[in-house]
Amino acid sequence: KAGNYDPKTTIVIDPRLVFSTFTGSTQDNWGYTATPAPDGSFYAGGIAFGSGYPTSPGAFQTTFGGGVNEDNNGPFDMAIIKFSANGSNRLFATYLGGTSNEQPHSMICDAQGNLIVAGRSTSPNYPRTIPQVGIGGGYDIVVTKLSADGRTLLGSVKMGGINDDGVNIRGKYVAPDGADGTRRNYGDDARSEVILDGANNIYLASCTQSNNFPVTAGAIQSTFGGGNTGISHFPQDGVIIKFAPNLSGVLFSTYFGGSGDDACFVLSLNPVTGNLYVGGGTNSTNLPGDKFGALHDIYQGGLTEGFLTQIR
């Protein structure tokens, strides 16, 4: 965030490099997300394509869970590592996954340094602390809370409908008809964000291709909006979910989308009102919500547009 500056001058952003390091993995390893902890330590999350990730003794999962070949990639598990504030020490490292494939999308820490990881999984035995939410199928959304020392699963949920959830239109497939528009809008298929409120409730913005994704009573939008059918995917809506702090249950869950493809990418809470702001991409001309007085109250054209919505 830039401070006060003269808009007539050139801004030079020259941050100081605190540390840069390899993970030490002897297996292929690809990074997706990272977050700081309250004490200045640092978490990084990615995927590892087999045994050889440098897990630490006593970590929650020290062995590779397994997986399948997917689009000429795989198998892969989530791979989570925590570094000291100066990057000189590995505080812990762990796999996170079941017998199929997993991928992290977003991470955040609570005030105690516990780590919340949001992503997706196709494993029927993904580590969780409550039963599957929804019937599941394809990729499901997963949210997991690990203790600050990486040893204990404090809470974990797997949630989804019959088709892919948490997948923003698989990136391998570029549709000539433009049906991959929301993927292009943000650059890849691994898009969702997790945040916390002051009571440590967990909020997630993501997407679903399931017309039976689990929603809660009184949801803003209880039915699937629809979308485009592309080379590799079903129609897609955004989803917005709130979980209990220990992931013991879903406090609310709703679709958010019109008759085109929609995806929720980012979210933020107003610290004064508690209202939730959600941003994403859409090619729906009938995106839900009261647009009276909005900067643009109708779809402006093009393959995909961004959107911002406020939920009270």
Spans of features found by a protein language model:
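A sequence-level/structural motif corresponding to short, flexible coil/turn segments enriched
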Residues: Y5-R312
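A generic structural motif
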Residues: K1-G3
